Amino acid sequence: MAKKNQIQKVYITENDLRNATTYIPLMKKVEFVDQCATVCFDRLTITPDGSVGAALPYMYKENSQLKSRFLMGALVKLYLGKDFVPVEGTEFLMSADDYDRYAGAHIFNQIERMKGKGVELRDIAFDLLHDFKDLEKRLNSEIYGLLQAQNDVVSRFQLLLTAQTSPEAFAAQRAELDSLMKEFEALKQGRSTGEQ
């Protein structure tokens, strides 16, 4: 009996590994990291009491599924030299379905198993996986650094102060103060004439 929603898996051959790139130049890695790291975030809106209203400056968290799809895209395109249709305007972002075709076939385990198929394939597999881990480490470091900068308490506090002292915010606060002053004057006037 066939399973429903079965993923069409992608398998690599010994020739695929022989033709693979085992080293991506540093500046190509930097280009990949620059292109991908800045979009691997989700914005969180946090209010002082957890309700909807005047929000504090945004905080950010890592979007791990985007990062996984970017990394799989890099493995497939840069190292294995295979094509896929990128999504969302970047050459390395795989669709979730394409990601599942490779991840569901345990692509990294396929490469690991090639180590047992002779010295040539073993060396290629070791070199490819080592260089890919370097790329992954660079992406992780960049995402971590960006998250730290974006979620920095002092920076967020400065944004909050800036938002509260903008000309628009100041004008709104001034209008509220004028309204309160008028109410106060009316109350004061009412007391002096004996009205309550």
Segments the model singles out, each with a brief description of its role:
Residues 37-196:
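Short, surface-exposed, charged amphipathic helix/loop patches that serve as local interaction elements
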Residues 2-65:
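N-terminal "first-domain core" detector
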Residues 1-5, 193-196:
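Intrinsically disordered, low-complexity linkers and terminal tails enriched in Pro/Gly
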